[in-house]
Amino acid sequence: MESEQMLEGQTQVAENPHSEYGLTDSVERIVENEKINAEKSSKQKVDLQSLPTRAYLDQTVVPILLQGLAVLAKERPPNPTEFLASYLLKNKAQFEDRN
């Protein structure tokens, strides 16, 4: 029985070519997904450069600017430029994934 379990264990290890480095199947999947996302991201950056000005702005800064301006209009701070700059810096992570 133990020899069967050892054989099963060895079979599982043999299925994962990177097991000798301690990489599990889930880690390998994560790495592959990251590679694919990086390739898509680099293709997207090239696409952004080829867009007309209006389309480029609509896809990059208009969404966060509209949200920031809406908050600015609602709160009406005494220093609106600094408020908007601060808002953009604080919330840019929410919108960077969309680009």
Curated annotation (Swiss-Prot):
Q: Where is this cross-link: Glycyl lysine isopeptide (Lys-Gly) (interchain with G-Cter in SUMO2)?
A: K35
Residues modified as N6-acetyllysine are: K35
What's an example Gene Ontology biological process for this entry?
A: endosomal transport
Q: Which residues carry this modification: Phosphoserine?
A: S19
Q: What does the record give as the function of this protein? A: As part of the MLL1/MLL complex, involved in the methylation of histone H3 at 'Lys-4', particularly trimethylation. Histone H3 'Lys-4' methylation represents a specific tag for epigenetic transcriptional activation. May play some role in histone H3 acetylation. In embryonic stem cells, may play a crucial role in retinoic acid-induced differentiation along the neural lineage, regulating gene induction and H3 'Lys-4' methylation at key developmental loci. May also play an indirect or direct role in endosomal transport.
Complexes and interactors: Homodimer. Core component of several methyltransferase-containing complexes including MLL1/MLL, MLL2/3 (also named ASCOM complex) and MLL4/WBP7. Each complex is at least composed of ASH2L, RBBP5, WDR5, DPY30, one or more specific histone methyltransferases (KMT2A/MLL1, KMT2D/MLL2, KMT2C/MLL3 and KMT2B/MLL4), and the facultative components MEN1, HCFC1, HCFC2, NCOA6, KDM6A, PAXIP1/PTIP, PAGR1 and alpha- and beta-tubulin. Interacts with ASH2L; the interaction is direct. Interacts with ARFGEF1.
This chain's protein is named Protein dpy-30 homolog
Output the lineage of the source organism: Eukaryota, Metazoa, Chordata, Craniata, Vertebrata
